[in-house]
Curated annotation (Swiss-Prot):
Species, as recorded: Methanocella arvoryzae (strain DSM 22066 / NBRC 105507 / MRE50)
Keywords assigned by UniProt, alphabetized: ATP-binding, Cytoplasm, Kinase, Nucleotide-binding, Transferase
Signal peptide (UniProt feature, chain positions): none
Protein name: Cytidylate kinase
Location relative to the cell: Cytoplasm
InterPro entries recorded: Cyt_kin_arch (IPR011892), Cytidylate_kinase_dom (IPR011994), P-loop_NTPase (IPR027417)
GO biological process: pyrimidine nucleotide metabolic process
Family from the record: Belongs to the cytidylate kinase family. Type 2 subfamily.
Pfam families: Cytidylate_kin2 (PF13189)
Length: 175
């Protein structure tokens, strides 16, 4: 089974991915983790690296290609990433969304940075990604019609969101 888990920065993708991997034994492939590693290797912030990626399509294309290759190597895989639901053939595509204010608080806690900085950097990153994905893929990130399940994660913690997804996966397995 292949599941994609996409969503906005700070929407809870990584936390939910861990819950799903634990319950179903999914191998998790994370685009965000790859992107953060590449940024760190170059000594850049995510905002700086995002601006670089805006002018260098090889960065996104390499991450996408790697995800596609890895997703074919395992029988049960969860592919986590902003574009995963649009670029990976999957049994279920999930999108997590949350208001920016809440996501900034989560990112602030995760990265140990002030909330205002997390807000500004996340907002800048999203503007950059909207432009980048439209330019490279002709994708409108605000169009969620390709997803089977869209969840507002401001209403539940990671376990609550995961329990909703567990039910959807269990029903899919019955079909």
């Amino acid at each position: 089974m292949i599941i994609t888990l996409s969503g906005q920065p700070g929407s809870g993708k990584t936390s939910v991915a861990k819950e799903l991997a634990e319950k179903y034994g999914f191998v998790v492939i994370s685009a965000g983790e790859q992107f953060r590693k590449l940024a760190a290797e170059r000594g850049m912030t995510l905002e700086e690296f995002g601006r670089l990626a805006e002018n260098d399509p090889s960065i996104d294309l390499a991450i996408d290609q790697r995800q596609k290759e890895l997703s074919r190597q395992f029988p049960n895989v969860l592919v986590e990433g902003r574009l995963a639901g649009r670029t990976i053939e999957a049994d279920m595509r999930i999108w997590l969304k949350t208001p920016l204010r809440i996501r900034a608080e989560r990112i602030s806690n995760r990265e140990n940075i002030p909330v205002h900085r997390a807000y500004d950097e996340t907002h800048a990153r999203e503007i950059c990604e909207l432009s980048r994905y439209k330019k490279y893929y002709d994708i409108d990130l605000t169009d969620l019609s390709c997803y089977d399940l869209v969840i507002d994660t401001s209403k539940w913690d990671a376990k609550g969101v995961s329990s909703i997804i567990f039910k959807a996966i269990d029903e899919l397995k019955k079909a």
